[in-house]
């Protein structure tokens, strides 16, 4: 006999529930204090409805607006699935009650996207709407509890979001048994997520508990909203999600039994979006509601999670009209030249050209022999010019070139033969002739000293024929012709005095002038100047330095003072700080073998002299980088007086005119004994620029005929061999500076405004207009 199984105890009956009835509106509980998230706060409340097979129709309304404290009107209370919405002012997410969790749609320009919770086993799709203040969305009207849906406008204040989730009240004949509940859990990034409170297992229409959630706008794209089948929620009533400003008092939000307003009215950051309750039925598998757009600006967008209806997207193609660009050949003349009736193949034998036409010009200059095109153009130019009297000579030449290119090789052959005959006759007539283009026509400078010095000369070297000092760095140096032992110091900072020995015998030797540039350099040979014995300053200005002063110089900055002749003397000139940067003028006497070189100190008295440090290869001031010769001296020079041939400016000295552009004349890496002298151009002497500004470019040293220079050694007074002298010259230079007498400006004006004498084959330096008596006094004092 089969044993009877013990029956399991029956489940406890559900607590009795009162039939649902309409409830009057009542005020809500005060919401907890909200936390601001980007000037907007969120308070979330969710509710869960009892799920019965026949009670799955719900209505949800999400209102996204800028609140002014007034809440939107609420629909009838009903059981519905909880939804947790996080929205921004331009996005609204519409969810069906039972569907899988829909991930938020990506939005590039949005900081947060809408997120939704899934509750029931429905496959309806959610809609994500991207709204703008000028967008109006009106879904078709549908009945809610038999009543028509009426759009409702809620004026709101900006910077406040109002989101409401409502559930319609269940009918009286619906089953009120409690089914499986689903909870909505916030993701791990929602730190202050939902706080759920439950007090019972039945859903009461009049009593409900609130679920409070606080959401942050940036955490919305990563918040996962999950629905659990095995989790039950106790007695959750109506759910309200509301946000408002933290510092604004909250107005009452009342839930009524009237029909829920369906539709969307968007005006001035105000959006109310609702779905009819029939849209969320259990048999509604796809949400396809038509939308009506009103007043959509070009910047407004509507973004759907699913495929949007095709009628919402209208693309218009803007026709691009191509603009014709008229291209005119540069070789074509501007005036239309008629060549129709002009014969262009006249043979040279028929033209009557002389054997060697125009071999010389008026000045007797031998011209080049004509080539084939010149022979052809000379024949046909008169006929073409006669047919086109309105065309000028340039236009005729352009047309002749075009017509010559149109000829075939056979048509050109007679002219090539004629050009060869002319060339042979020209060679017989002028056997040693070599073509040399005139620099004037090709805009080249002649090989003259004045044009060489008019550029930005950086290194001037005058040597004997056996010694050539190549360019190594930006320096200013002068080597006196015929010197075997010389002295050297740079113009770098300021020497106490510039002393130069004289050659033992005054003999003519070439002066090699280097014009360095980036591409190449070239020397220019110039006959040496014969200097007249005129001192630059009165005799009382001269005082010879003692040998102890010279030998007391530090080793790192010492100069080797060597005399080329036993009787040669050195003389220095002292000058005050006001005229410290004036030119150093040489005055040599070709009468006697001992020759004196008077010079001017280039250090201002106000300049502090640091102690000497033996740095053999360093710059007190770094020289500027080498560039084009026109840019080597972009800054104004620091000389108070500029020799006109040392003046900076956009002078161009072509390297092609200098025949010696290859080593050893080109610059490169050379020994370090070359003095570094460009520190003289540094900022320390800028303040002395304005002292003699009235004399700049005004003294008559540059206006010489025959393009000769008179005093090219006025800028720098040092030779090439010997250790370089740097700016720190110690106490020896201090004695030179302390004994400087004062010199008035008028004396210097007389010096530099002296009238120039008539130049001859030998260059002269006329520095002052002192007489012979002063010369004798100077020689006696020295």
Curated annotation (Swiss-Prot):
Residues 512-522, 555-574 have a biased composition (Polar residues). Expressed in the lung (at protein level). Expressed in testes (at protein level). Expressed in preleptotene spermatocytes, round spermatids, and elongated spermatids in the testis (at protein level). Expressed in pachytene spermatocytes during stages 3 to 8 of spermatogenesis (at protein level). Increased expression in diplotene spermatocytes at stage 9-11 and in metaphase spermatocytes or secondary spermatocytes at stage 12. Expressed in ovaries. Interacts with CTNNB1, competitively inhibiting CTNNB1-TCF7L2/TCF4 interaction. Residues 1-37, 95-117, 139-226, 501-604, 704-724, 756-782 are annotated as: Disordered. Residues 366-434 bind DNA. It comes from Mus musculus (Mouse). Acts both as a transcriptional activator and a repressor. Binds to the DNA sequence 5'-ACAAT-3' and shows a preference for guanine residues surrounding this core motif. Binds to its own promoter and activates its own transcription. Required to activate the expression of postmeiotic genes involved in spermiogenesis. Binds to the promoter region of CTNNB1 and represses its transcription which leads to inhibition of Wnt signaling. Also inhibits Wnt signaling by binding to the CTNNB1 protein, preventing interaction of CTNNB1 with TCF7L2/TCF4. Residues 203-226, 704-718 have a biased composition (Basic and acidic residues). CDD domains: HMG-box_SoxH_SOX30. GO terms for cellular component: chromocenter; cytoplasm; cytosol; nucleoplasm; nucleus. GO terms for molecular function: beta-catenin binding; DNA-binding transcription activator activity, RNA polymerase II-specific; DNA-binding transcription factor activity; DNA-binding transcription repressor activity, RNA polymerase II-specific; RNA polymerase II cis-regulatory region sequence-specific DNA binding. It is found in: Nucleus; Cytoplasm. InterPro entries: HMG_box_dom, HMG_box_dom_sf, SOX30_TF. Pfam families: HMG_box. Induction: Induced in germline stem cells by retinoic acid. Residues 7-35, 97-106, 525-538 have a biased composition (Pro residues). Disruption phenotype: Knockout mice are viable, morphologically normal, but males are sterile. Male mice exhibit small testes and epididymis. Multinuclear syncytia present in the seminiferous tubules, with degenerated multi-chromocenter round spermatids and multinucleated giant cells in the epididymis lumen. Increased numbers of apoptotic cells in the testes and epididymis. Increased expression of CTNNB1, MYC, CCND1, and MMP7 in lung cells. Increase in diplotene spermatocytes in the testes, indicative of defects in the later stages of meiosis. One of its GO terms (biological process) is negative regulation of transcription by RNA polymerase II. The gene is Sox30. This is Transcription factor SOX-30. Keywords: Activator, Cytoplasm, DNA-binding, Nucleus, Repressor, Transcription, Transcription regulation.
